[in-house]
Amino acid sequence: MNKDKLSEIGLALERAVRNDCEKNITISFSGGIDSALVAFLASKYANVELITVGVKDSHDIEAAKSAAKIINLDLTVKELNDEELISEAAILQKKLKLTQFEVGFMLPFWVAAKNAKNKTLMCGQGADEVFGGYARFRESIDNTNLDEETRSLLEIIPNREKKISKLFGLKLSCPYLSEGVIQASKLYSKKQHIGIVGKEKLREAAIGLGLSEEIANRKKKAAQYGSGSQKVMKKKIKHEINFEMPFESDKVAESIKKATDPENDGWVESS
């Protein structure tokens, strides 16, 4: 019976991926189970472009390189230096009015969307909410409500991932948030999903679908930490790096700062 349940999850996910596949698609890729499983399945139905984003030697770039090699897909690496990352962060914050935490989290997706060569952008968003992947779930299973986590994300997606996709003329695909996958996930309790390391049933289903155990059992860093964006953002706050777009005078900078508050949210500064 357990194999039947896992098969239901696998079939639902493969169906969701297949339904959104065009001839050519781009996948925002980190090398963790969420994006790797989507990429592995999509490669059966489409020509897949993988894009990973991060600072030099970041966890996501190294993980993505090894995962892409395992599933035998080409990988495009967008490696940003500190100034480039902060420049993109400023643009992202202005466009979407996100908090600093959200900017750090969404930067890899933003850069992937900006550089996508294909019109469909597929991602692994939703896997943690639907299948119980966050560490905080393991710390307090009794207080975890995966249905509520999923509903909350579905409300956020239109103003975040979907909006970014539209800005670059892309169609967004989030297979883990398809109705079929969400319903299939309910075959297991939250405790069974969360397990010891998180997303236990998704990992088992992924192996059943043929994904490498090495990838399926990987622990994944949060996007903002895996890509290195959060580290750079903290450096900005502490003024450890110097990224400047100089104005004619402090008076001009101060005038622009006041005129754009609260939109600039700390991005425009005067000395």
Residue ranges and their predicted role:
Residues 121, 126-143, 152-238:
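Mid-to-C-terminal catalytic subdomains of enzymes
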